[in-house]
A protein has these predicted regions:
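Extracellular ectodomain surface segments
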Residues: 1-60, 124-206
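Acidic, turn/loop-rich segments in luminal/extracellular domains of secretory-pathway
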Residues: 49-120, 197-217
Length: 217
């Protein structure tokens, strides 16, 4: 078996690899080696039809992608974006598959270990909205519901802060689940960016920007 680094799609050959340490062998020099079964580690075997290659072989879904292998030992592994997006930049994860090798008489098994290298995936910032009574103050504390002095109570789509709102349509997100989202700049529409200090909040060292009808901190 072999270990390969893979981002996106990766192809290889478990029988005729160029690495001597990973090459499958048979003491019977005249025997022809073929892959007859494949499974994800811990799963059930699926048969691999004779005469197949990685283009028309048997596909098995792993944790982070799908491996397709032929009887000739050739295989292709395609990472699934949704599954692999949670692997952060600089981190890695493995998908392990077990294949059965046959010479027509005897069989043995070995592993294919695919190492998926994480990358910094694009995060998504959603537009946010606030509603306020004239002459009042709207406060959206970190992780809390918005509230406004006066008779208006902002709930639903206007609840929560800009990172962690209760409305999924307004919630900012990052596929790299181990990353921490922070606000780094703020500006009024059409204005210039002002830096937001790390560790600040709206009521402690936050950045104030004056808009057309009021000031946002």
């Amino acid at each position: 078996g072999s270990t390969y680094n893979a981002t996106g799609e990766h192809s290889g050959d478990v029988i005729n690899t160029t690495s001597g340490n990973h090459q499958d062998r048979d003491e019977d020099a005249s025997a022809t080696l073929t892959v007859t079964q494949i499974k994800k580690n811990g799963g059930s075997n699926s048969s691999v039809s004779s005469g197949t290659t990685n283009s028309n072989g048997t596909s098995v879904t792993g944790t982070y992608g799908t491996l397709t292998i032929g009887a000739d030992g050739s295989y292709t592994y395609a990472a699934t974006a949704d599954a692999a997006d949670g692997i952060a930049d600089g981190e890695s994860a493995t998908d392990v598959f077990v294949y059965t090798l046959s010479d027509g008489t005897d069989t043995t098994t070995a592993n294919i270990t695919i190492t998926i290298l994480g990358q910094n995936d694009a995060l998504t910032a959603q537009n946010d909205e606030g509603v306020i009574m004239e002459g009042s103050t709207l406060t959206v504390a970190n992780g809390s519901n918005a509230n406004v002095s006066g008779s208006y109570d902002a709930t639903g789509e206007h609840s929560g802060d800009v990172l962690d709102t209760t409305s999924s349509s307004h919630k900012d997100s990052d596929p790299d689940t181990s990353d921490t989202l922070t606000i780094t700049h703020i500006k009024k529409d059409g204005g210039s960016n002002s830096a937001v200090s790390s560790g600040s909040s709206y009521n402690s060292s936050g950045t104030a920007v004056t808009g057309a009808y009021g000031t946002l901190t």
